[in-house]
C-alpha cells in the first residue's frame, strides 16, 4: 500500500512527510513529490529515521512516478497565506496547481483516494471533482477536503476555556474550511462523554476564535508564514486514519465531501464521515443544532455555495 504526498517540500509538506514516516502502518510506501529539487533530499533525510515506512522523493514538473500505484494521495502543494491575504486570494494561484496535479492523478492512479489540504479547500475540492468527472473517473467516495484542523482547534480552544483535559473533549465542526463557513457545534460538545455548557457570550467568542484561528497564526508569525505545523499534524491525523480505514480499520472523521442529494446542504460540505475500504462509506447524521447554529448554518450556505460555484466554473468556464 502506498501514500503519495504532493507538495512535500513546502511548509506543511516537510513536517507532514516526517509525521507520515513516523505514523503510517508498517510496510507502507511513502512517495514524496514537489517541483522543488530538494525533494529527493527530504526523502533521504527522513529515511534515516528507523521506522518500517519506506520514503522515496521525486522532483520536477511531472509527479507521475510518485503517483504510480498510490492508494492515497495527499495534496499540500500551493502557496501559503500571507498577512492581508484571504483564502480566496490564494485561489488564483492554487487552483491551477491543484487542477494540474489532479489531472495527473486521474491519468496515473484513477482509483486512488485524494485528500486536499491546499487552500481554499471550499473551492479546490469542487475543482478536483470536475477534473475527475471530465476524465471519467470521478468517485465521490474517493475525494475529500481535509478539515481536521478546524476540529483540532475546536477541541483545543474548548478544553482551554472549560479547563478540561484536552483528550477528553469532542467538538463537531461542520460546513466549510474558511472563516464564516466553519461551524463548530458547541451545543454537541462533550467532555468525558458528558455535555459541556456555555454562556451565549462564550459560544460567540469561541465560534469566532475557531473560525479565525488561521488569521491568528498568520498575524502572530508577523509575515513569516501561516499555520504549517498544526496543519501538518492535523493532516497526519487524517491521512493515517483514512489509510488505516483503507486497510479495514473502523474510522470516523470529519471531512469536506460531496453531500447526499436532497440533503439540504451545499453540494460539498464537511460532515462526520465513516471511512472504509473504498473511502467514504457513509455520511453520518449531523445531529440537532441549536437556534444559534441553525442561524449560522443559514448564513454560511450562500457563502459556501458561491465558493463551490467558483471552483466548478474554473474548470467549466
Curated annotation (Swiss-Prot):
One of its GO terms (cellular component) is cytoplasm. The lineage of its organism: Bacteria, Pseudomonadati, Pseudomonadota, Gammaproteobacteria, Pasteurellales. Gene3D superfamilies: Lactate dehydrogenase/glycoside hydrolase, family 4, C-terminal, NAD(P)-binding Rossmann-like Domain. Its EC number is 1.1.1.37. This is Malate dehydrogenase. Belongs to the LDH/MDH superfamily. MDH type 1 family. The keyword Oxidoreductase applies. NAD(+) binds at residues 7-13, 34, 94, 117-119, 231. The active site is at residue 177. The gene is mdh.
Amino acid at each position: 500500500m502506498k501514500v503519495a504526498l504532493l507538495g512535500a517540500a513546502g511548509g506543511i509538506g516537510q513536517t507532514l512527510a516526517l509525521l507520515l514516516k513516523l505514523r503510517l502502518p508498517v510496510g507502507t510506501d511513502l512517495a514524496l513529490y514537489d517541483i522543488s529539487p530538494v525533494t529527493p533530499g527530504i526523502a533521504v533525510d527522513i529515511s534515516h529515521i528507523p521506522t518500517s515506512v519506506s520514503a522515496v522523493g521525486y522532483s520536477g514538473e511531472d509527479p507521475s512516478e510518485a503517483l504510480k500505484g498510490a492508494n492515497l494521495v495527499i495534496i499540500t502543494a500551493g502557496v501559503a497565506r500571507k498577512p492581508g491575504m484571504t483564502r480566496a486570494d490564494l485561489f488564483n494561484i492554487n487552483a491551477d496547481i491543484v487542477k494540474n496535479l489532479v489531472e495527473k492523478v486521474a491519468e496515473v492512479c484513477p482509483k486512488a483516494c485524494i485528500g486536499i489540504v491546499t487552500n481554499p479547500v471550499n473551492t479546490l475540492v469542487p475543482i478536483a471533482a470536475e477534473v475527475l468527472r471530465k476524465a471519467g473517473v470521478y468517485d465521490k467516495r474517493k475525494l475529500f477536503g481535509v478539515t481536521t484542523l478546524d476540529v483540532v482547534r475546536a477541541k483545543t480552544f474548548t478544553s482551554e476555556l472549560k479547563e478540561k483535559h484536552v483528550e477528553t473533549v469532542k467538538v463537531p465542526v461542520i460546513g466549510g474550511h474558511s472563516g464564516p463557513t466553519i461551524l463548530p457545534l458547541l451545543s454537541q460538545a462533550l467532555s468525558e462523554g458528558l455535555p459541556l455548557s456555555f454562556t451565549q457570550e462564550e459560544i460567540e467568542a469561541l465560534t469566532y476564535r475557531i473560525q479565525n484561528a488561521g488569521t491568528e497564526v498568520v498575524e502572530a508569525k508577523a509575515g513569516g508564514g501561516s499555520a504549517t505545523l498544526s496543519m501538518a499534524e492535523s493532516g497526519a491525523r487524517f491521512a493515517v486514519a483514512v489509510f488505516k480505514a483503507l486497510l479495514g480499520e473502523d474510522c470516523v472523521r470529519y471531512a469536506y465531501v460531496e453531500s447526499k442529494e436532497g440533503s439540504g446542504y451545499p453540494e460539498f460540505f464537511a460532515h462526520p464521515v465513516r471511512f472504509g475500504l473504498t473511502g467514504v462509506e457513509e455520511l453520518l447524521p449531523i445531529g440537532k443544532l441549536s437556534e444559534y447554529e441553525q442561524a449560522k448554518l443559514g448564513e454560511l450556505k450562500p457563502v459556501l455555495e458561491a465558493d463551490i460555484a467558483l471552483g466548478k466554473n474554473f474548470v467549466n468556464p
